[in-house]
Every structure is written in structure tokens, then in C-alpha cells.
């Protein structure tokens, strides 16, 4: 066998590595306390539809959200009036600031603004406000777009107006395409998904047949390895293209996916597909299609590397009908992320996982593969529950928060029942049934926690016991917080720091706003902690209230390169700003560690 026989294989390998490398390069490093400037976290654009109508779009970065009730429109001059805004439904989120459920938007927001008989050009001013999941709330942002009532064609997209409180800090301009997602973790997850998909009952029996078609009857082990890998890479190219297409489609479908009917239709599709995984019906291509595709693949030379790659691409459609439901769930996830690069990398990893057993068979390691049996049926059922979870995840943005928590509870408990968690194990049960029992108990407890949380007033499935914690904190007799001295301008801060330096005391400057959810959490959960109060006993406590978002407030935020509250700046006893700062919400333990790093144990008195 000559080296030239491996050239097509090498080209396929290079293509696969190039796809993965491009996806990796798309991920910048992001520190835990780096936040996007508001104009990048909430990218504003607008297009004039006709003389009176403007379509407004916000591209919301991953890890950020906007408030529905904070959206408002105005005109300059103010004589122009507008029809009432028709905003799409948002995701319901419990807001600690207002102590009620509020609607929020993620990923994308599209709505139209209609002026009432505007005769002359005017500027449309859109006011919006949003927050980051990590705890920072931005001041209200005003974006401006020029409207020409006589315009007959769409105007170009508007440039965003720099929001109040933005700064030139380099760290805040680090943009994360995945919103902090880990591409390596996503690749490993989809690689494992591909392995699991291969071991479903309708795919595993086909591995020896496919191996015989690809490798041929008289291939050496080296030749078999080359042809098998080529087959897998051919299949991977198809799946990668599907993943990229799903990501690109997701970018264009984000606005449509905010519609409750569209979300409901996708969720219903996931439920229908899950029924196939539970064995209620068989899902596969029509017999005529499968026959024609098989004939086309059989006409190719069985032992050629290039032919194997083409057959791998064809087999992406005919090899595994059982893969279709789980693949649909994966594509639904990719489409919602709206990231084409991640979509391609994820599906490439999944196809590689699906191809590993085929390569093992091709090189003669078929004896390492498990036999088909009952556990493979269980694997299909696991995917069925995953698809039900995908359905719930898709429709969750339009569900009331309490209903979403109840639905997750029902799904988790149903999975526990399927694992026979509440059935007695025989005395001679093996390790796998016992492991299933353990997993079932964990699922049942997780479902019970959701029910307890919703009964206690929790409204977040990821933090189901938040209501219990709020009730517990409210019941504490000693919930006194620290007392701050209010400052309103840069000059007042400088004067207060100089006064503290004269007495040899360090300073802590806290940024606060009434509309800041995480500020309320810091006030209620962190600054009321006895250990925090003790550690701050000898520290001069300043607080800048930037609720009004006036000129002095913006100057203060800019002075310390902040986008918004909550944030805490420290000064040592000599008046020097400490390199350590707190951005976003921190619980008492974490805040104490930050305080001691900033001021040292000598100045930040440790609690006893």
C-alpha cells in the first residue's frame, strides 16, 4: 500500500481540523468579571419600513437580558406621537427589586414603532434597560434613529447611541460569541451524544454490515483503518454542514422563535419525536428513498478511500433512522444558540462519536462492541426523556415561571419512575440496577425540590429554593445592614477619601441603584451578614446612588470604568485605589474573601 492512498484521507482530516480550529479561534478568553459595554450587550438597529413605521431590533448577547417594561419610545421633536407598542411576550422572571414576576427578553427582540401622521423628519428615541446574568444592571440606554416620513425605501441600519455610563475599559470590551460557553465542553458533550446514538438498537446491528461494505473483503488492517476513517469523516462533513446551517438559520429565526405559537409547535415536534424513542412508532425514511440511496452507495468502489468518504456522506441519511429524533433535538439547541461555528463544531463532534464504533469494527475490534440487549432499549428511553426536556426548554420562555417549575418537577419524577426508583430491588441485583436506583432517587429529589420551591414562592427552576431563602432571611430578627455615607459626585468621593486617609482608615465605595436587582441582593443578603458587618467595622463606607443616571452619576461610573451597579471599589488607608474590586453580586463568604484581598487582614478586620 502506497502513501498516495492516504492523501484523500489526509485532506479530509485537514478539513475537519480546520473546522474545529476556526471554532476555537472564535472563542476569546473571558474573565469572570468582564462585562460587555451596553451598546455591545444590547446591539440596537432599526429599519424604516414605510413613511410611518420603523422596525426596531435588539441583538442581545448571551448571558444578558432586557426588561420588557423598561422599553419606551419618544420623538424629537416631541410633537410626534406613536401608536401603543405591540411587544412580543417575554420570558417571565421573578424580580427581587419589584417583588413580582417581570418579562424579560434574551437573544433577540424585534418590534415595530408606528408614528401617527408624522409630516416632517424626526428622531426616534428608544429607551431600554437590561442586566447581565452575573449580576450587573446597566443604566437606561437611549438609542436614536432618524425617520424620514417621505422615504420610499428602507433606510440603512441605525448605529447605536453610546449608552450612559459606558467606559473605555479594555476588559469590558471582550466579546464572547458563546456568552461564556466552553467550546471544549460542548464538543465533549456532543461526542458522548454521538457514542450513545450509535448504540441504539437499530444502529448497532448495522455496524458489521456497513463495515463489510466500506472495507471490502480483502483489506489489510491498515487499509481498513484508512477507509473506515474516511467513511467517518465523510459522514462528519455532512453533519457539520447541517450544524452550520442550523446555526445560521437560528440567527434569522430568533425573532420568530419569540412567538408563543412557534415555540409551541417546536415543542410539540419534540414531544412527537420522543414518542418514537419510547417505541410508540417507528421513525425512518420511506422505503423507496432508502432503497435508492442504498443502490447509489453500492455503485461506488468499496475499498477506495475517496469512495468510502462519499458513502459516509450518503450514509448520514440512511444508516441510522433512530438518530433522527435525537438529532432533531440537537439541532433545536443549536438553532436557539444562533451560532453557526458552534453548530458545526458540535455536529462534527457528534458524528465523530458516532463513527468511533465503526472504526473499531473496521480495524477488527468488533469483539469490543457490546451486544444488543435490553440496555439499548433503555438508551432510547433516555433520549426520549432528553427530548421531552428539550421540548420544555423550548417552550419555557412563554410559560409562567411557576408552571415551568411544575413541568420540570413532573418530568424529573417521571424519569425516576421509569428507572423503577420506587420498586424493590431483588437481593441479587447487579451494579447497574443499583446505579439506576441511585440516579432515580436523585431525579426524584430534584423534582421534589422544584415542587417545594414553587410552593414557597420560588420562580426560577435553576434556583428553586430562592423563595425559601428569602423567607428565611426575612424571618431573621437581626437583619440590620451596614450604614453608608451617600456621595453624589467625583469631588465628594475624593474629599471623603482624603478625610479617611487623614484618620488612617480604608474606604469602601459601593455603587447602588433602585432598579438594580443585584444591588438589592447585596443589601439584603451580603451587607446584613454579621461577619461582613464585623469586617467593615473600621472601614469608611461610601455609597453612590446612580438611580437617576444624571451627569454626576455617569461621571462617577466612568471614573472607575464601570458600566453600572452593583460594584464596589476599595481604597487603602493611604488613599490608593486597591487593584481588587467587586463587580456584580457576591455572597457573604465570597465578598469577605474579596475584601481581605483588597484591604488585607490588618485593615479589613476578620470576624470572630
Swiss-Prot record:
EC nos: 1.8.1.8
Compartments in which it is found: Cell inner membrane
TM region(s), chain numbering: 193-215, 227-249, 259-281, 302-324, 344-366, 373-395, 400-422, 435-457
Family from the record: Belongs to the thioredoxin family. DsbD subfamily.
Signal peptide start and end residues: 1-31
The reaction(s) this protein catalyses: [protein]-dithiol + NAD(+) = [protein]-disulfide + NADH + H(+); [protein]-dithiol + NADP(+) = [protein]-disulfide + NADPH + H(+)
Function: Required to facilitate the formation of correct disulfide bonds in some periplasmic proteins and for the assembly of the periplasmic c-type cytochromes. Acts by transferring electrons from cytoplasmic thioredoxin to the periplasm. This transfer involves a cascade of disulfide bond formation and reduction steps.
GO terms classed as biological process: cell redox homeostasis; cytochrome complex assembly
Nucleus found in the keyword field: no
Main location class: membrane
Domain Thioredoxin stretches: 464-600
Cellular component per GO, a single term: plasma membrane
Membrane topology: Multi-pass membrane protein
PROSITE patterns listed in its UniProt record: THIOREDOXIN_1, THIOREDOXIN_2
InterPro entries named in the record: Cyt_c_assmbl_TM_dom, DsbD_gamma, DsbDN, DsbDN_sf, Thiol_diS_interchange_DbsD, Thioredoxin-like_sf, Thioredoxin_CS, Thioredoxin_domain
Gene3D superfamilies reported in the protein's UniProt record: Glutaredoxin, Thiol:disulfide interchange protein DsbD, N-terminal domain
Disulfide bonds: 131-137, 202-322, 516-519
HAMAP family linked to this entry: DbsD
Protein name, entry field: Thiol:disulfide interchange protein DsbD
Pfam families: DsbD_N, DsbD_TM, Thioredoxin_7
Molecular function GO labels: electron transfer activity; protein-disulfide reductase [NAD(P)H] activity
Source superkingdom: Bacteria
Keywords: Cell inner membrane, Cell membrane, Cytochrome c-type biogenesis, Disulfide bond, Electron transport, Membrane, NAD, Oxidoreductase, Redox-active center, Signal, Transmembrane, Transmembrane helix, Transport
